[in-house]
Amino acid sequence: SGSCSLKTCWLQLADFRKVGDALKEKYDSAAAMKLNSRGKLVQMNSRFNAPTIHDLIYIDPSPDYCMRNESTGSLGTQGRLCNKTSEGMDGCELMCCGRGYDQFKTVERERCNCKF
């Protein structure tokens, strides 16, 4: 009869946090590579499994994010505030890069607009 059927597929992005966590995991397990004498990419450390098409690889190592580096735009971590009780990215152990850190307490007063 000349009629057409229309099928629409909708794709939705995954949760931003999940995407970020997955990328960070791949970054942390990326394989170091080098060019051999024939110009072919080979793995730097043959003790590890060869990377698959789903793995990240790199030739140049990442900069030291702990230190200020104007050429890469890294501000470093020196002088930043950290959270002593956190084991995450904002934690002092990770952020201070083994340099140690000073501790201090602050008292903050805020108007809470409480009504009694």
Curated annotation (Swiss-Prot):
Gene3D superfamilies attached to this UniProt entry: 3.30.2460.20
Record keywords: Developmental protein, Disulfide bond, Extracellular matrix, Glycoprotein, Lipoprotein, Secreted, Wnt signaling pathway
InterPro entries: Wnt, Wnt_C
Keyword Cell cycle listed: no
A single GO cellular-component term on record: extracellular space
One GO term (biological process): cell fate commitment
Carbohydrate attachment residues: N69, N83
Covalent lipid sites (O-palmitoleoyl serine): S1
Disulfide bridge partners, by residue number: C82-C97
Localization (cell): Secreted, Extracellular space, Extracellular matrix; Secreted
Entry comment on modification after translation: Palmitoleoylation is required for efficient binding to frizzled receptors. Depalmitoleoylation leads to Wnt signaling pathway inhibition.
GO terms for MF: cytokine activity; frizzled binding
UniProt xrefs under Pfam families: wnt (PF00110)
Biological role: Ligand for members of the frizzled family of seven transmembrane receptors. Can activate or inhibit canonical Wnt signaling, depending on receptor context. Required during embryogenesis for extension of the primary anterior-posterior axis.
Family: Belongs to the Wnt family.
Protein name: Protein Wnt-5a
